A protein has these predicted regions:
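Inter-helix linker motif
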Residues: 135-151
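A structural signal for short, well-ordered beta-strand segments and their strand-loop junctions
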Residues: 13-14, 59, 116-118, 138-140
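RNase H-like nuclease fold core
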Residues: 26-118, 123-128
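Short, surface-exposed amphipathic charged segments that create phosphate/polyanion-binding patches used
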Residues: 150-162
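Short, amphipathic alpha-helical "recognition" segments used to contact nucleic acids or chromatin
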Residues: 1-8
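Residue-level marker of motif borders
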Residues: 56, 137-139, 293
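Acidic/histidine-rich catalytic cores and adjacent linkers
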Residues: 67-68, 79-84, 100-101, 109-134, ...
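Short, basic interhelical loop/turn and adjoining N-cap
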Residues: 9-29
Length: 329
């Protein structure tokens, strides 16, 4: 049935068949779907498990299903059509102990099959995976690692912007007190200082070779005004380049070289990043064994969010989970 295979609203599917949406939903939910006889209904609000979908390579991530409540999703890296049979577990909550208790409901033999689990840097995920999949190694997703470094650079930019706004507000007040009209300093590209810092956000995410002419001009002015931000930008590019390596040993060497530069730069935000990365370093370096990422989990989460958005929110959580099972498990 289309409802079982399409992550769409009942109203959209009903309009396709030219029937009333409420009639279709009532008929599907109570007559043909099997929802009333669902074998996981008694514990659906707490967890759902699908041991038959376990493979050697898994991903674990969290997603908000309803009213901001977070659920933990364990999925395989099934590349089949529309992520069919990709869900291994759906767990209400993100607490390590709760995740572990649910995963341990899957028989030990199946859990020992798992060789690799990719994830973000969340400590709770790491603890749950370590205790539940004892034969597996954990791989921290490169996207989350690089984003942490880039966030540190952007934090510097935002702090500088707020400082520029504060200085401008003081200057405006002084001009007003002196019964003068405040005229902001306009830079050579037409930006004021606060505008320069606001409009530089996206160029800092890009490599120099990808800048437009206007972005290159803006970057030149930005780095002339704020040389420490230029240093942070260069350090960010160097860190991203580490992931071009195919050797774990070479990647570690480059990380240590990068760390030395961070210490020398004495940039507070980057010192904090180094401490975080060192805590997770072994799992970060595991990426270079098979270059595994959490991209499939992020893609799957996007599909769930899109499905939820189509429904304009989730009113019946159990029925929503039931439909997720039909679609993806």
């Amino acid at each position: 049935m289309q409802v079982d295979t399409r992550p769409d609203t009942m109203s959209n599917i009903a309009s396709y068949y030219n029937v009333k949406s409420k009639t279709l939903q009532r008929h599907y939910k109570h007559k043909v779907s099997g929802f009333k006889e669902w074998n996981q209904a008694s514990h659906a609000e707490d967890y759902l498990i699908y041991p038959e979908n376990i493979t050697e390579n898994l991903s674990i991530d969290e997603v908000s299903l309803s009213k901001g409540e977070l659920y933990t999703f364990v999925t395989n890296k099934n590349k089949g059509v529309k992520n069919k049979k990709c869900v291994v577990a759906i767990i209400n909550g993100t607490e390590a102990k709760v995740i572990q208790q649910v995963l341990e409901k899957i028989e030990s033999e199946k859990r020992l099959v798992v060789k690799e689990v990719s994830m973000d840097m969340a400590r709770n995920m790491g603890l749950a995976v370590k205790n539940s999949f004892q034969n597996s190694k954990m791989v921290i997703d490169r996207f989350h690692v690089v984003r942490l470094v880039m966030d540190a650079m952007q934090h510097m930019r935002v702090s500088l912007r707020w400082a520029a706004i504060k200085e401008e507000n003081i200057a405006i007040k002084q001009a007003k007190d002196n019964k003068q009209k405040y005229i902001a300093l306009v830079l050579s590209n037409g930006d004021t200082l606060r505008e320069l810092l606001a409009r530089s956000r996206y160029l800092l995410y890009k490599s120099e070779s990808d800048w437009t002419v206007n972005q290159a001009k803006r970057a030149s002015i930005l780095f002339e005004k704020y040389p420490l931000l230029k240093t942070a930008y260069k350090l960010t590019l160097e860190f991203r380049a580490i992931y071009k390596n195919i050797s774990k040993i070479k990647a570690l060497e480059q990380f240590n070289e990068w760390k030395t530069k961070i210490i020398a730069s004495n940039i507070e935000e980057f010192n904090t990043v180094v401490n975080s990365l060192e805590y997770h370093l072994d799992n970060i370096l595991n990426f270079f064994d098979n270059r595994s990422t959490n991209a499939n989990a992020e893609s799957f989460n996007s599909k769930i969010k899109g499905f939820r958005a189509n429904l304009r929110g989730v009113t019946d959580v159990n029925f929503f989970l039931f439909r997720l099972e039909k679609l993806f498990a």
